[in-house]
């Protein structure tokens, strides 16, 4: 039985501790839109998205009003466009027309982001997939709401190093194409290893081919709630610490489950998953870094940071799986630098380096996220960082990703402003030694021995 204390506790979480539903993401399959005629394909894509998603934003606002739960974003993910446009597109420019159509549809239904301008190339690349990848810089430069992702490896297939090399070049080209906006295009481009089919979070969301025609996935956010709960157990042993995180994660996820089921029922679209991720914002008090510091670190980046993050990630999952029948997506703690005030402060005080962030990604849900680096960083160095991150994901059988922003015209120590939820970031140094000869070998890194389970 729910008592009045629990009701007040939830209200306090929302009003004072920044508890919110970060996103309701509607996944839409576009496989039935495929056509050999590009104009027909674009028409079908626009018509399907605007038909299926027409009530998404209104329903989200309705649930917000009725339950008093803030729902920050309403978003859409679609089938990877390299699969949808393969028959009709014969050049990168053809794919850009689809990006413009998706952008128009997103604007029409009122969502702030649409993900799925994507290619899955973990083992090899078709011509269509290569064309889509080559179109990414132009597509992100001429659209407002489109997010792009490329899966370049997996535990079962290994790492496609040809794709890794190409993505190093594409990240740099995207930075150049959007340099008048502080290279903002790179904030909407993610390179994955082991990308999940049901991720509700941008910029890596796409509607996987294993999914149905449409599905509702929800991502929750509650770093402020977890930090506040830990303040009450300061100095207690690890058992108490873990129990506190776990119970708090349960409450946060329960709210996400409620919103997901309500949205599903009102839209007449099946519920997919709740993503258990703790997603920070640039607001003070809504930070994953501050949780780690509340555990006892002087600053994020200090010795013990990776252990603290591993503990947090595991307890969030243990609490979350009790609260929802279906969990998925990325599910863990996000550590984006520009979107987390505590991370920004740690970088500015010299406590948190790119290498330490890489170590942290081995125990949390995503990877090197929203990190600004000098605009003159070589493409092969970016590719090397992508390869390192993919190797962590491949060997550990987990999702890892890279969202680096080489800011054209900026150098180490400069600050770059992205605005809104994307925040701002200090430009961090990158190792100056070259990996070009390694990246230029080409081919594939084979799957690890423990992937051979048949």
UniProtKB/Swiss-Prot annotation:
Recorded family membership: Belongs to the UPF0210 family.
Alphabetical list of NCBIfam families matching this protein: PRK05313.1
Cited HAMAP family: UPF0210
Coiled-coil portions: none
Protein name, per record: UPF0210 protein Mlab_1030
Pfam families registered for this protein in UniProt: DUF711
Organism from which the protein derives: Methanocorpusculum labreanum (strain ATCC 43576 / DSM 4855 / Z)
């Amino acid at each position: 039985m729910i008592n009045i204390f629990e009701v007040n506790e939830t209200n306090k979480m929302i009003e004072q501790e920044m508890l919110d539903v970060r996103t309701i993401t509607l996944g839409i399959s576009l496989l039935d839109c495929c056509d050999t005629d590009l104009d027909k394909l674009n028409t079908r894509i626009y018509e399907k998205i605007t038909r299926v998603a027409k009530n998404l934003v209104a329903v989200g606002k309705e649930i917000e009003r009725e339950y008093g739960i803030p729902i920050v974003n309403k978003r859409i993910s679609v089938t990877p466009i390299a699969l949808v446009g393969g028959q009709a597109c014969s050049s990168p420019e053809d794919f850009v027309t689809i990006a413009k159509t998706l952008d128009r549809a997103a604007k029409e239904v009122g969502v702030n982001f649409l993900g799925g301008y994507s290619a899955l190339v973990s083992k090899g690349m078709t011509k269509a997939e290569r064309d889509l990848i080559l179109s990414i810089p132009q597509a992100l430069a001429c659209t407002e709401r489109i997010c792009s992702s490329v899966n370049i490896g997996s535990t079962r297939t290994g790492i496609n190093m040809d794709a890794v090399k190409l993505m190093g070049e594409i990240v740099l080209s995207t930075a150049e194409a959007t340099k008048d906006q502080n290279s903002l295009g790179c904030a909407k481009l993610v390179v994955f290893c082991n990308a999940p089919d049901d991720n509700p979070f941008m910029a890596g969301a796409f509607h996987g081919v294993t999914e149905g025609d449409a599905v509702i996935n929800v991502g929750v956010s509650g770093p402020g709630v977890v930090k506040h709960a830990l303040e009450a157990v300061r100095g207690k042993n690890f058992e108490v610490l873990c129990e506190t995180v776990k119970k708090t994660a349960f409450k946060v996820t329960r709210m996400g489950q409620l919103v997901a089921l309500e949205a599903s029922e009102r839209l007449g679209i099946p519920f997919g998953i709740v993503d258990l991720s703790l997603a920070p914002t640039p607001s003070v008090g809504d930070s994953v870094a501050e949780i780690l510091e509340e555990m006892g670190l002087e600053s994020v980046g200090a010795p013990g940071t990776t252990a603290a993050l591993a503990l947090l990630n595991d307890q969030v999952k243990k609490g979350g799986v009790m609260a929802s029948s279906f969990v998925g997506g990325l599910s863990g703690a996000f550590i984006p630098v520009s979107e987390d005030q505590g991370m920004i402060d740690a970088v500015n005080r010299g406590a948190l380096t790119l290498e330490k962030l890489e170590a942290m990604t081995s125990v949390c849900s995503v990877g090197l996220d929203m990190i600004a680096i000098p605009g003159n960083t070589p493409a092969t160095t970016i590719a090397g960082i992508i390869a390192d991150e993919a190797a962590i994901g491949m060997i550990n059988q987990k999702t890892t990703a890279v969202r680096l922003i080489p800011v054209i015209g900026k150098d180490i120590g400069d600050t770059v402003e992205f605005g809104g939820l994307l925040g701002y970031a200090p430009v961090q140094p990158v190792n100056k030694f070259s990996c070009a000869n390694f990246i230029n070998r080409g081919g594939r890194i084979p799957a690890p021995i423990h992937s051979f389970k048949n």
